[in-house]
Design a protein with these regions (language model features):
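Conserved glycine-rich Rossmann-like NAD(P)H-binding loop of the short-chain dehydrogenase/reductase
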Residues: 28-42
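C-terminal tail/cap regions
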Residues: 195-196, 200-263
Length: 263
């Protein structure tokens, strides 16, 4: 697909998957706008693009990002909602063990960041006959991340919101792509060499996630799965839920015995 002079806006764009997305789109001719808590302005210089310090939990800042992008570069053709945060079950490692503040932050970033992006980017796209909205969720949004109930729950919500966008606006020209990787070599993995449970099927580079996303856009498929086994796991989860839950409990016991913590 030719992205020459297309405008691509990316949240969480200063590093990791977001930066890899920017590199992939720019290599195909796109103009790039990046937003992040820090580093966006510096990262955008590599693309002669727009960089903005922005927090997706603040409605006005998301609106400003859309407005500034369109004022500087033109109408947004592709919006990538990539900003995310990993909240675990610490300190108790009970499923309800995370603080209310951590649950709320996961909700505000992992779900509402996408909702606010759509709220402000989609109306203009609709007036122009359509656009592309990418939500970077996680395999945890289809399965579960052991030791991280807030992350799992809010990534499930992000997948559901992506589906809702497609159902509500697909007939109006909106193409929605939902990206659901397992382990990706980003800061979210921390210091773990093997990625812990997230790396059970191997760790991929952010560039691989970007390439799979571009392929999904070109092939007009809803899911972009950098780890293909995720599709099989989801099928098993849906068709054999009790077996899947039992397998996940067994896996949690194994991780706990090896590491003393589930993540």
């Amino acid at each position: 697909m030719d992205y020459t002079n297309k405008v691509v806006a990316i949240t969480g764009g200063a590093r990791g998957i977001g930066l890899a997305m920017a590199q992939a789109f720019h290599a195909r001719g796109a103009q790039i706008a990046l937003a992040d808590l820090d580093g966006a302005e510096a990262a955008a210089q590599a693309f002669d693009g727009l960089g903005m310090t922005m927090d997706v939990t603040v409605e006005g800042q998301v609106a400003e990002f859309v407005q500034k992008t369109e004022a500087a570069l033109g109408p947004i053709d592709v919006y990538v909602s990539n900003a995310g945060v990993l909240m675990t079950d610490e300190p108790s490692w009970d499923a309800a063990g995370a603080t209310d503040a951590n649950w709320q932050l996961a909700f505000e970033v992992n779900l509402m960041g996408a909702v606010r992006g759509a709220r402000h980017a989609w109306p203009g796209m609709r007036e122009r006959g359509g656009g592309i909205f990418v939500i970077v969720a996680s395999a945890a949004g289809l399965l579960a991340q052991i030791g991280a109930a807030p992350y799992t729950a809010t990534k499930h919500a992000a997948v559901a919101f992506a589906e809702s966008l497609s159902i509500a606006h697909g007939d109006d020209g909106l193409q929605v792509v939902c990206v659901c990787p397992q382990g990706v070599r980003t800061a979210m993995l921390g210091d773990s060499e093997d990625g812990g449970i997230a790396g059970v099927d191997g760790i991929v580079e952010p560039s691989a996630v970007a390439q799979v996303t571009l392929t999904a856009i070109e092939e007009k498929t809803f899911f972009a799965l950098p780890h293909p086994n995720v599709a099989d796991y989801e099928t098993m989860r849906a068709g054999q839920r009790d077996r899947w839950l039992g397998g996940m409990r067994k896996f949690r016991r194994k991780i706990m015995s090896e590491r003393g913590r589930p993540i």
